[in-house]
Amino acid sequence: MAEAAEKYSDLLHLKKAFATLATLMPDGSPQVTPVWFDYQNGVLRVNTAKGRTKARNMAPGAPVAVAIVDPDNPYRYVQVRGRVARVAEQGADVHIDQLAKKYLGQDKYPYAQPGEVRMMVEIEPKSITGMG
């Protein structure tokens, strides 16, 4: 797993690649959403607002999969499969601001809605594979 994480380090750390996050609905059907992400200390982190479908699907222990396609070469990608390790409101506003810096070049997340509660979701990889 560490070898794949190293091989695709540019996608996990440097590029402004969106991740496609797959979660499971209560009936077992897949739900797929493009998301911003970061990867730190072997943990993939995404951010969402409380009440959204993907947030409801990502309780601790829930299985998830993420595909990250290289924006410079669509035939190259990394896939992370794992489980939700942690969901936290604390630190989620800071995290979404960090992601806004990465993806938009802005210090503050500009799309916050009044009363919105952010959630940071940490995904513990069980496998990391890729192509290209």
What are these regions, as identified by a protein language model?
Residues 4-8, 54, 95:
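Hydrophobic alpha-helical segments typical of transmembrane helices
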